[in-house]
Curated annotation (Swiss-Prot):
Record's protein name: DNA-directed RNA polymerase RPB5 homolog
Keywords on record: DNA-directed RNA polymerase, Host cytoplasm, Transcription, Viral transcription, Virion
Cellular compartment(s): Host cytoplasm; Virion
Keyword Transcription assigned: yes
Database matches in Gene3D superfamilies: RPB5-like RNA polymerase subunit
Main function: Component of the DNA-directed RNA polymerase (RNAP) that catalyzes the transcription in the cytoplasm of viral DNA into RNA using the four ribonucleoside triphosphates as substrates.
Amino acid sequence: MAMQKLFTYIYEFIEYRKMVLLEEKVPYDKFVQMIFNTGFFRINAETLNHGIVSVFIFGANGKYVHHGGDMRTLLTNALNEKKQYEELILIVDKPILGKKNILDIIVEQRAANPTVVINIYPYHLFCINIPKVSAIPRHKLITQEEAQAFLGREYLQPQDLMQISASDPPVVWLGGRPGDFVQIERPSETAMHAVVIRYITKSKI
């Protein structure tokens, strides 16, 4: 069931982020077959800035999420393809996020590739279309200029704002990065919406 949802919503995520697929979408049975046979499924897409984003969906029991050397080789080879990488998104079963050998490789690859955003997330972030969940307030990234104008009006510094993690589900779907600002519209008893600004901080993983 998780794989069926992942297959559906990862493509909705790519569309929501306004990315363009670089390969034709495969049928679901081929998606499952590739994860079962090779241990992962990869989607390549291009951003509005012409950067490349590669999404890797890993099987829960494949070699890449249990053997650090295999994960290191896979990521190193991908990043050596000389593409204009903007981001690598690694999607794994939640227990993998507790494996030190895998997380150490993520840290290692980030240090070796400082211009590429490398993030690892659990399946459940992509098993639902987060922006369509009615219980979640609307989130929107604002520009640095808009944020500075707001801070100036309110006589605030970024550190004065309440924070939100880069791993928060709506921020992940938006593509927010540490140092960005997100505007959140919450229902209000005195107005249609109460607008708040949050400062995005680095995630723990």
